[in-house]
Amino acid sequence: MREGIHPDYYQAKVVCNCGNEFVTGSTKEEIHVEICSKCHPFYTGQQKASSTRGRIDKFNKKYGVSNN
């Protein structure tokens, strides 16, 4: 392999907006993220019912689609 062409690899500190921090490998020394597994609704079990159901009903009503 040629020397000097590969980026440096660091033990990067990942910082979330919720305050959670963890370490991973990356070519950057520090990474800032908006959502992590500690605060994401899927992982915390605090998912809210989505409005998708209402949108589907609105579409079906608009175009006369029945659920048969």
UniProtKB/Swiss-Prot annotation:
Query: Which Pfam families does UniProt cross-reference here?
Result: Ribosomal_L31
Q: How does it assemble?
A: Part of the 50S ribosomal subunit.
Give the family, as the similarity comment puts it: Belongs to the bacterial ribosomal protein bL31 family. Type A subfamily.
Instruction: Enumerate the GO terms in the molecular function aspect.
Output: metal ion binding; rRNA binding; structural constituent of ribosome
Task: State the organism of origin.
Answer: Lachnospira eligens (strain ATCC 27750 / DSM 3376 / VPI C15-48 / C15-B4) (Eubacterium eligens)
Keywords from the named record: Metal-binding, Ribonucleoprotein, Ribosomal protein, RNA-binding, rRNA-binding, Zinc
The UniProt entry, under SUPFAM superfamilies, shows: L28p-like
This protein's GO CC annotations: ribonucleoprotein complex; ribosome
Q: Which BP terms from GO are recorded?
A: translation
UniProt-recorded name of the protein: Large ribosomal subunit protein bL31
Coiled-coil regions listed in the entry: none
Source organism, top-level taxon: Bacteria
Function of this protein?
Binds the 23S rRNA.
Query: How cofactor binds (record note)?
Result: Binds 1 zinc ion per subunit.
Which amino acids does the record list as binding Zn(2+)?
A: C16, C18, C36, C39
What's the cofactor?
Zn(2+)
